[in-house]
């Protein structure tokens, strides 16, 4: 058995005493990814998606990215995003939504800066 323990002295990176909050967790099945949807954004939350199986295409902020199993997609608050169903093959994902995230040097509910690729 391998065990890892957190250090007793931990300095959080969160600004202004805010503590991020998990809003939702979803499992997106293969069948769901085959249906057309519209690009959308979340003004008040960050969304993280983990590609469990398959491959396809995903649009984030007007850029189309090839995605495959093992990829993580970061959708900062306010950024347009969604799948491109016609290019998806056996795609399933896990998704979480987080709010109240404030990291130094970034807008609220942003995990990465705009110049970093979200995949």
Q: Where do the model's predicted regions map?
A:
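Ligand-binding loop in jelly-roll beta-barrel domains
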Residues: 78-101, 109
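Generic protein-terminus/edge-of-domain signal
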Residues: 1-68, 72, 79, 87, ...
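Structural signal for conserved beta-strand scaffold positions within catalytic alpha/beta enzyme cores
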Residues: 27, 95-97, 118
């Amino acid at each position: 058995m391998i065990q890892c323990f957190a250090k007793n002295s931990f300095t959080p990176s969160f600004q202004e005493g805010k503590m991020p909050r998990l809003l939702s967790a979803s499992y997106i099945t293969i069948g769901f990814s085959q249906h057309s949807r519209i690009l959308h954004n979340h003004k008040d939350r960050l969304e993280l998606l983990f590609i469990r199986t398959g491959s396809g295409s995903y649009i984030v902020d007007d850029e189309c990215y090839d995605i495959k199993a093992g990829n993580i997609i970061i959708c900062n608050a306010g950024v347009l995003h969604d799948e491109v169903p016609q290019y998806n093959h056996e795609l399933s994902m896990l998704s979480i939504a987080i709010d109240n995230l404030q990291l130094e040097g970034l807008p609220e509910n942003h995990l990465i800066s705009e110049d970093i690729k979200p995949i």
